Amino acid sequence: MRKPVIAGNWKMNMTCTEAIEYMRVLIPLLKDIPKKDREIVIAPPFTALYPLSEFIRDRNEYLSLSSQNVHWEDSGAYTAEVSPLMLNELSVKCAIVGHSEPRKYFSESDEQINKRAKSAQDHQLIPIVCVGETFQQREMGEAERVIRRQIEQGLEGIEVKRLIVAYEPIWAIGTGKTCEANEANRICGLIRKWIGYEDVIIQYGGSVKSNNIDEIMSMSDIDGVLVGGASLDPTNFARIANYEKI
């Protein structure tokens, strides 16, 4: 039985003060979620990980933290990077790797993403490995080939039992355009087939909102969501976390 993971990626948003105030609103709104039914994850900016880890320590039983990236070395001359050892000290559970934004803005390769994912697993972190195609690649009929390459190269040598994959069609991220639920489900099913492990957790990401979450989570091969902009409002994110299957 695959346990859905609802994750909010704040990206480069919220100061430490704002993050704490957010949690003061969010945590009470999650109290009725069946804890055995789903897991809730927040990926704040690196600066907010420490205050949030301290704040939620004794305040909830169902909320975990994720980093927005992780380096493959434990330490060294890697300006602006964060090591897995640093994250371990903060009781961080997951690490997002391969998101389309660092792929686009910092030219991250599948090889680098693979190294990040391996480093995460080597330090007891669960990597959330993001894959997805551009609009042009989809229009040219290249979506499946591109995603399969990302899976094969990005997950080489990865322990699939300690892994989350997030399918995020790049053309749907932050655009208001959502991949139709049936099509997202089809791609997630293909990803599961390519990985070759039935119980791998596969999320969908791309303009997930409170008004489409119930349909998305009703799909048979979608095991959660990776939410961007819609996770910045605690009331809105709570509605997403409290989804009900149709």
Swiss-Prot record:
As its record notes, the protein acts as a catalyst of: D-glyceraldehyde 3-phosphate = dihydroxyacetone phosphate
Record: residues binding substrate: 9-11, 174, 207, 228-229
| Pathway recorded for this protein | Carbohydrate biosynthesis; gluconeogenesis; Carbohydrate degradation; glycolysis; D-glyceraldehyde 3-phosphate from glycerone phosphate: step 1/1
Give the keywords, sorted. Cytoplasm, Gluconeogenesis, Glycolysis, Isomerase
Per UniProt, subcellular location reads as: Cytoplasm
Tell me the SUPFAM superfamilies matching this sequence.
Triosephosphate isomerase (TIM)
Q: Name the EC number(s).
A: 5.3.1.1
**Active-site annotation:** 99, 168
Annotated Gene Ontology MF terms? triose-phosphate isomerase activity
- Can you tell me which residues the record assigns to a coiled coil? none
Q: Which Pfam families match?
A: TIM
Q: Which GO terms describe its cellular component?
A: cytosol
Q: Which GO terms describe its biological process?
A: gluconeogenesis; glyceraldehyde-3-phosphate biosynthetic process; glycerol catabolic process; glycolytic process
Q: What does this protein do?
A: Involved in the gluconeogenesis. Catalyzes stereospecifically the conversion of dihydroxyacetone phosphate (DHAP) to D-glyceraldehyde-3-phosphate (G3P).
How the protein assembles, per its UniProt entry?
Answer: Homodimer.
Q: Which family does it belong to?
A: Belongs to the triosephosphate isomerase family.
Protein name (Swiss-Prot/TrEMBL): Triosephosphate isomerase
Task: Tell me which species this is from.
Answer: Prochlorococcus marinus (strain NATL2A)
